[in-house]
Curated annotation (Swiss-Prot):
E.C. no: 4.2.1.11
UniProt-listed SMART domains: Enolase_C, Enolase_N
Native species: Enterococcus hirae
Regulation: The covalent binding to the substrate causes inactivation of the enzyme, and possibly serves as a signal for the export of the protein.
Pathway recorded for this protein: Carbohydrate degradation; glycolysis; pyruvate from D-glyceraldehyde 3-phosphate: step 4/5
Gene (name only): eno
Cofactor note: Binds a second Mg(2+) ion via substrate during catalysis.
Catalytic activity of the protein: (2R)-2-phosphoglycerate = phosphoenolpyruvate + H2O
HAMAP family named in the record: Enolase
Name the UniProt record assigns to this protein: Enolase
Gene Ontology terms, MF aspect: magnesium ion binding; phosphopyruvate hydratase activity
Amino acid sequence: MSIITDVYAREILDSRGNPTIEVEVYTESGAFGRGMVPSGASTGEYEAVELRDGDKARYGGKGVTKAVDNVNNIIAEAIIGYDVRDQMAIDKAMIALDGTPNKGKLGANAILGVSIAVARAAADYLEVPLYHYLGGFNTKVLPTPMMNIINGGSHADNSIDFQEFMIMPVGAPTFKEALRMGAEVFHALAAILKSRGLATSVGDEGGFAPNLGSNEEGFEVIIEAIEKAGYVPGKDVVLAMDAASSEFYDKEKGVYVLADSGEGEKTTDEMIKFYEELVSKYPIISIEDGLDENDWDGFKKLTDVLGDKVQLVGDDLFVTNTQKLSEGIEKGIANSILIKVNQIGTLTETFEAIEMAKEAGYTAVVSHRSGETEDSTISDIAVATNAGQIKTGSLSRTDRIAKYNQLLRIEDQLGEVAEYKGLKSFYNLKAA
């Protein structure tokens, strides 16, 4: 009864109006699962391959009909007949079917769509919530959210080099209260920007994209918004950032070019000094991709300098890849990994990366992409793995809010068992 009988993929649109893939899996019993695949704007050099058509006459070359065909004509034939509950075997079968190290033949987007749909169909068959199916019945930790309320870099057309300026409501007692705090700060920020004649239009992830005088001004205006909302910076709400430094690193010169803000060129050592100054001045608890993904020597220096007091998250650095993460752990580089399901391409590999991180004392931050859908699977993954942190955008745009609303439902379902750890989510820091 739990045998897969049909697999069907179609081309849909993501939150940026670009094509992506949606997959449906059906079983003998009538159980059903659907998975939608996100897409990134700033992508790591070593990410699994997102298969696009390249036909400029259609969606500017961004169509995914090849990936859709790969699901409907190749993957479907291979996995029909499998028990939908055998997630690992199905994921491994798709990896073998692709046969490349980066899923470049079938496409990570094709494979991931199936992987998510299979998990959802299995949960439907067993009549349990997805987070319980994926994580068992010890799932209880609601993640502390990183809320991206000012967008810059590749996510916005403005004068800010850093890609994301985020708040984390660590002082909240529950996820529900954390969400309220975040929303109140978001609206306070809107009022401040409007009063200064600055834009309150939003970027890809729902945050504001104002033209500020410097990168540092992003932190200053957020501190002001936290206080305006009635909270204490550093106690109730802390700051986090995603520099996405690979996006402004000049490989030929070997320097970081802060061109959007006009702050000029900086060496690796100067960037590290810059982060030290920011951390001493503002309640910043997390820095993501502070240096270029290939600047491992620089990352080692950064970790030695700030690793005890600041969460140093590897996104482009690790690309949710256990080989990359294992190398980083061995060399003492960073102390956290960003988890993006489409960087690696299956749920099995995603869970392996989270487990490896935790065993090494690294935190795992489950993350969305800038091109999202209404699919809220990452909310269930965050709870299923007791990851403790999630990054899923600002307090606007339904594609972001869908994840937060799912977490509200999960917290309600868990009832008294639910835990919101706030500052204790940073078990990788001595100060926390």
